[in-house]
Amino acid sequence: MSGGVYGGDEVGALVFDIGSYTVRAGYAGEDCPKVDFPTAIGVVLERDDGSTMMEIDGDKGKQGGPTYYIDTNALRVPRENMEAISPLKNGMVEDWDSFQAILDHTYKMHVKSEASLHPVLMSEAPWNTRAKREKLTELMFEHYSIPAFFLCKTAVLTAFANGRSTGLILDSGATHTTAIPVHDGYVLQQGIVKSPLAGDFITMQCRELFQEMNIELIPPYMIASKEAVREGSPANWKRKEKLPQVTRSWHNYMCNCVIQDFQASVLQVSDSTYDEQVAAQMPTVHYEFPNGYNCDFGAERLKIPEGLFDPSNVKGLSGNTMLGVSHVVTTSVGMCDIDIRPGLYGSVIVAGGNTLIQSFTDRLNRELSQKTPPSMRLKLIANNTTVERRFSSWIGGSILASLGTFQQMWISKQEYEEGGKQCVERKCP
């Protein structure tokens, strides 16, 4: 075995699972990540005269470069000229400087230990490109000089977290909903089906609803004080006096935080295809916005998530050919070899934060059982706890990196030095 033995339990391998919405990181062998903070980060570019803003809790980039504000607390402070950006696009790293800032921050503030002491297992999108994988490998070995590295596809890790090596992973996160077939721990690339209808899409739908209802979205950072008002009456709040000139992207990010809270508290998927009459009978949910305005939401709380299952229902997308969630699953299975289909239908694993909308799995189960051929046994695997569903690929990574049998799988520093960054293609399927 090359490059020295790494005993998974003793070394304390680190597991990074960087998604489009949050970053999850922590030690292998633990049952949940140590940190979970937004992937969106604040960036203040340099002023013309070369001076930046006051340095308090920012992470300075390269000399004279931008200042990054990472983690919930630093990001949510209003600052002049701070843009909110995300290093990822389509689940893959796009902006390497800000991606590196996230890693630096995690090592400095949360791991609080030398990067060179811990092997790293990192999750990646199943469609990650070869060039990006090699660049990431190079970054980890050259810049952080870690002792060993491994890249694993998110879907495979999710399957492992649920004790399976074969199954169909339905992952609905922030930017996309995907069905990914996994067989014996390998992703079947030809069967991947993606749809852009996911968490961010629901956020957009909520935004449109608020515009129709004339509800003004006021993020908490603007509010100095507010008074309790009767249901449905106009809000009575005072604006903060000295607010800096914030950028549009950052203000948007703060508004989205409010909407995401609304999404989690109010929305529900209807049990069967959306029907005005049935929806009107459903109990309403009371919600209060940060500025004190409050009202009840009835049918609309079922109408918004309906777009996930029945895209023809969504206004503004008429004539679209997008697939609903259950179609994504059946299409994906249909693209796989006929012999392995029973194994896929037999463990459809639901993961991702967007699937936590109330009754999501019930509706999916119902639709799939109507679409599954009678010869197949359908089994839907969905953890009930938020943690396991949001962190499923991190948990899978934690299990994998601490297995004794996995220890010969690492790309060791020695192998990297001998074989270069190409070894990631060979060692990490």
UniProtKB/Swiss-Prot annotation:
<protein>
    <recommendedName>
        <fullName>Actin-like protein 6A</fullName>
    </recommendedName>
</protein>
<dbReference type="GO" id="GO:0000723">
    <property type="term" value="P:telomere maintenance"/>
</dbReference>
<comment type="similarity">
    <text>Belongs to the actin family.</text>
</comment>
<feature type="modified residue" description="N-acetylserine">
    <location>
        <position position="2"/>
    </location>
</feature>
<dbReference type="GO" id="GO:0006310">
    <property type="term" value="P:DNA recombination"/>
</dbReference>
<dbReference type="GO" id="GO:0005886">
    <property type="term" value="C:plasma membrane"/>
</dbReference>
<dbReference type="GO" id="GO:0071564">
    <property type="term" value="C:npBAF complex"/>
</dbReference>
<keyword id="KW-0234">DNA repair</keyword>
<dbReference type="GO" id="GO:1905168">
    <property type="term" value="P:positive regulation of double-strand break repair via homologous recombination"/>
</dbReference>
<dbReference type="GO" id="GO:1904507">
    <property type="term" value="P:positive regulation of telomere maintenance in response to DNA damage"/>
</dbReference>
<dbReference type="GO" id="GO:0005634">
    <property type="term" value="C:nucleus"/>
</dbReference>
<dbReference type="GO" id="GO:1902459">
    <property type="term" value="P:positive regulation of stem cell population maintenance"/>
</dbReference>
<dbReference type="GO" id="GO:0035267">
    <property type="term" value="C:NuA4 histone acetyltransferase complex"/>
</dbReference>
<dbReference type="GO" id="GO:0000785">
    <property type="term" value="C:chromatin"/>
</dbReference>
<dbReference type="GO" id="GO:0030071">
    <property type="term" value="P:regulation of mitotic metaphase/anaphase transition"/>
</dbReference>
<dbReference type="GO" id="GO:0006275">
    <property type="term" value="P:regulation of DNA replication"/>
</dbReference>
<dbReference type="InterPro" id="IPR004001">
    <property type="entry name" value="Actin_CS"/>
</dbReference>
<dbReference type="Pfam" id="PF00022">
    <property type="entry name" value="Actin"/>
</dbReference>
<dbReference type="GO" id="GO:0045597">
    <property type="term" value="P:positive regulation of cell differentiation"/>
</dbReference>
<feature type="modified residue" description="Phosphoserine">
    <location>
        <position position="86"/>
    </location>
</feature>
<dbReference type="GO" id="GO:0060382">
    <property type="term" value="P:regulation of DNA strand elongation"/>
</dbReference>
<keyword id="KW-0805">Transcription regulation</keyword>
<dbReference type="GO" id="GO:0045596">
    <property type="term" value="P:negative regulation of cell differentiation"/>
</dbReference>
<dbReference type="GO" id="GO:0045582">
    <property type="term" value="P:positive regulation of T cell differentiation"/>
</dbReference>
<dbReference type="GO" id="GO:0140288">
    <property type="term" value="C:GBAF complex"/>
</dbReference>
<dbReference type="GO" id="GO:0006338">
    <property type="term" value="P:chromatin remodeling"/>
</dbReference>
<keyword id="KW-0832">Ubl conjugation</keyword>
<comment type="function">
    <text>Involved in transcriptional activation and repression of select genes by chromatin remodeling (alteration of DNA-nucleosome topology). Component of SWI/SNF chromatin remodeling complexes that carry out key enzymatic activities, changing chromatin structure by altering DNA-histone contacts within a nucleosome in an ATP-dependent manner. Required for maximal ATPase activity of SMARCA4/BRG1/BAF190A and for association of the SMARCA4/BRG1/BAF190A containing remodeling complex BAF with chromatin/nuclear matrix.</text>
</comment>
<keyword id="KW-0539">Nucleus</keyword>
<keyword id="KW-0804">Transcription</keyword>
<dbReference type="GO" id="GO:0001825">
    <property type="term" value="P:blastocyst formation"/>
</dbReference>
<dbReference type="GO" id="GO:0070316">
    <property type="term" value="P:regulation of G0 to G1 transition"/>
</dbReference>
<dbReference type="GO" id="GO:2000819">
    <property type="term" value="P:regulation of nucleotide-excision repair"/>
</dbReference>
<dbReference type="GO" id="GO:0042981">
    <property type="term" value="P:regulation of apoptotic process"/>
</dbReference>
<keyword id="KW-0227">DNA damage</keyword>
<dbReference type="GO" id="GO:0051726">
    <property type="term" value="P:regulation of cell cycle"/>
</dbReference>
<dbReference type="GO" id="GO:0016514">
    <property type="term" value="C:SWI/SNF complex"/>
</dbReference>
<keyword id="KW-0156">Chromatin regulator</keyword>
<dbReference type="GO" id="GO:2000045">
    <property type="term" value="P:regulation of G1/S transition of mitotic cell cycle"/>
</dbReference>
<dbReference type="GO" id="GO:0045663">
    <property type="term" value="P:positive regulation of myoblast differentiation"/>
</dbReference>
<dbReference type="GO" id="GO:0007399">
    <property type="term" value="P:nervous system development"/>
</dbReference>
<keyword id="KW-0341">Growth regulation</keyword>
